[in-house]
Amino acid sequence: MAVIAMTREMATRGSEVAAGIAERLGLAIIHHEIVEHDIAERTGMPESEVHRYLEGEASLLERWTLDRKRKSRYTAQEILELAARGNLMIRGWGAAYLLKSIPHVVCVRICAPMPFREKVLMERLGLEDAAKARREIERNDAAHNGTMQRLFGIDWEDPSHYSIVLNTARIPVVDCVEQIVRLTESPAFGESTQSRSTLMEQLVLARVRFAMDQRFGPKSLQNGFEVHVFSGKVLLTGATIDEQMIADAVRLLQGVEGVTGVESKVSHVAFVPHAN
């Protein structure tokens, strides 16, 4: 089942490319609102707060109260959960970056030069001022690049994150669709037992990290425990002064979907108070 992750610049006709691919291949298109809803549901945060954070609109105080690593893990888990369903296209929120190591996922970036984008936006919104269109495009680009930098520390314009980069100023929408459809049909992007295993291993790791966050808070992964997943088997390493936490973590992770076994190599370090 085809899985496509697409990133598109504003006013590049990327939505037309996405619609054309979905129609040709019978794919569901997953928009960012669905990802936001799922993250809000898992974290207990209001959807409006999740949206503001992902759009780069949160205030400085709000950003202090939001753990970047935890939000990036929640985003990663939602994207991986969606990809595991198959037969869909995921647009935005770092899906192309998060899924680029999955062999059967086609990661696409749609872009175009600024003059082309200005013209598209002016026609779409009925604008007569090119400068106004440019400002809106630049604001949108900055917000999206800021989100990728904040969550994953990457430049979304880096072509190495994608299977294919298409410039719609030079390549018509219909030809973009054809190029991407051909990639999904190529043996290089065929789903195999190995590629499915790679996806599931990353998904189980994301589920495990989420479970640890929910049960013990971010300190479990930031200060003490490290989590590794190999073919569904979880290995805990690290050190902690909390011996009960080790036993609790093993029991917790045994119940995580996709986990087939848990081994702990976490060292218990006795707490020795400093002498006065």
Residue ranges of each PLM-predicted region?
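Glycine-rich phosphate-binding P-loop
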Residues: 5-19
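Short, ordered loop/turn segments at secondary-structure junctions
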Residues: 9, 34-35, 93-95, 112, ...
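ATP-dependent small-molecule kinase phosphotransfer cores
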Residues: 35-87, 127
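N-terminal targeting leaders
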Residues: 101, 112-113, 119-124, 140-141, ...
